[in-house]
Amino acid sequence: MSNEKAGGYISKIHFNDGTDVDIQQNDIVIFVGPNNTGKSQSLKDIYALASEKQPTTVVTDITIKKSPTNIKDLLDSIAPKELQGSSALYNVLGHAFYYNKDTDDLFLSEPYFNVFLNLFVANLDTAARLTICNPPDSITRKSPKYHPIHYAAFDSKYRKWLSNNFKKAFGIEISPNILNGSTIPLCMGPTVILNGEYDDEQSRQEDFASKLETYKQIQNQGDGIKSFTGILLYLMLDYFCTFLIDEPESFLHPPQARIMGQIIGHTLSNQQQCFISTHSEEIIKGLLEVTPERIKIIRITRKEDTNYFSILNNDKVKDIWGDPLLKYSNIMSSLFHKSVVLCESDSDCKMYSVIESHLKQSYGKYSETLFIHCGGKHRMAKIASALRALNIDVKLIADIDVLNDNQVFKGIVEAFGIEWPSVQSNYNKIVANLHSPKEKINRNEARTTINRIIDNSH
C-alpha cells in the first residue's frame, strides 16, 4: 500500500497581476503586508478555487497536483460507512462523502477537489475557530464523528496531543468531558487521577465526572483561548492535506502567538502544506524556529485597485534565519513597516531613529520607519537583497570605512540593483583620495560647506 497521502496539494498559485508562484507539498506559505491589501482575501480565494474554478479577487486560479492513493482507504480509516445501493456514504465532520467504483477515476480527472474539498482542505478563519469550541452533542463510540472534539473524546492519541499543546501556551491541561450528559465540553484543569478505592467501576466514573464538573469549560473562556484551541482541534486531524489559517495570532498575547507558530511548524507533516495570513512577527518567528526550510513569504501591497506580490523563497528565508545575529534581530518586523533603514549597529539605529522621529514630528507626522541593525557591514547586502525582494522600501546607512573593503561595498551596491561597473570608477577615485596623504582642513571653509549642504537639504 502506498504511503502517499490521499488527496493532493496546491502546486501553483496564480495572482491577479500575472504572478505565478510554485508551491511545494510541504510549504508553509505566509502572506504579509499592510492592512487591506488582500492577505485574508487570498485565503478565501484559495479555498473557493480548491472546490472549482470561479470568479475570485486576488488569487485568480490554483493548480492542484492529485495523489493516486485510493480515497476509500482514507474514508474507511476515519469514518464508518453506510451502504446506499452501489455507493457508500461517509459522514466526516458533518460533511457527507459518497464513494463508488468510479470515484477515484473521476477525482483524478478533475482539476479541483470539488465534492471532496472539505475532506482535504481545512479552512480556519476566525469565526470557525471560535465556534468550533462549542460542545458538540454526545455520540456513541462507533458513531460518525461530525466534530473534532469527538476525536479527542474517543481516541487517547488526539486527547493527549490536544492537552499537551494547550498546556504549552497556557500552563494547564484540557480534557473532553464524555460524562457530561447531552454534550461533550472541553474542560480546563489538571488531568484527573483517581487513587481512591471504589466499590465498582460505576462509582469511579461518578467520582471522575464530579471532578470534571468543577473545571472551567473552554467555550466560556476568552477569545484568545478559544481561538488557540480552535486551531489545535483542526491541526490534530492529520488527514487534511492543506490548512488555511487566517491571522492565527488573533486575540493572543505575543508569547502565545509564538508558541502557536511553533506548534504549527512541529505538527504539519511533509505531506501537508499551510497558507497563513498574519500581522504577527511572533507567529513567523515561531515557525522559523522549528522549520525555516519550509517557509515561503509572500508580501502583498496594493496601489488603488491593483495588487502587487513579492516572494521570498524558502532558501532565502533559511539563509537569513541561519545567521545567529540576524535570527535574534528585529528583521522580521520589517515585513510590517512602510520603510526600513539598515544600520551597522544598534547604537547607530538609536541615533538615526531619534533624528528621523524629530524631523517627522516637526512636520506633524509620525515615523513609519523601522531601523534594523545588521551586526556589522558584512551582513548588509544579504539583508538588503532579501527585503528588496519583498518590495520593501529599504535604505542603508553604513560607516565610511565600508569603502575600505571592495567586496563588501560591491555587494551592497549590487544588492540595490546597481551595476558595479557604473560606480567602480568613482569608487576608485574616492578610495584613492581617502588613502592619500591628509591635507589640513580650513575650518571656516568646512563650516561654510557644511552649512550650505544643510540649507540645501530643506
Task: Please describe what each predicted stretch is.
Residues 2, 45-135, 139-140:
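Conserved P-loop NTP-binding catalytic core
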Residues 2-6, 12, 122-228, 233-242, ...:
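Extended helical coiled-coil dimerization/tether regions that scaffold
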Residues 46, 50, 162-174, 264, ...:
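Hydrophobic, Leu/Ile/Phe/Ala-enriched alpha-helical segments that form helix-helix packing faces
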Residues 69-90, 195-216, 220, 423-457:
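Charged, glycine/proline-rich intrinsically disordered loops and linkers
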Residues 1-52, 197-333, 350:
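Switch/communication elements of ASCE P-loop NTPase nucleotide-binding domains
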Residues 285, 300-458:
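Acidic, divalent-metal-binding catalytic cores of TOPRIM
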Residues 2-69, 132-151, 357-398, 402-403, ...:
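Conserved, well-structured beta-alpha core segment at the onset of a catalytic domain
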Residues 109-118, 161-194, 330-349, 360:
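N-terminal-biased segments
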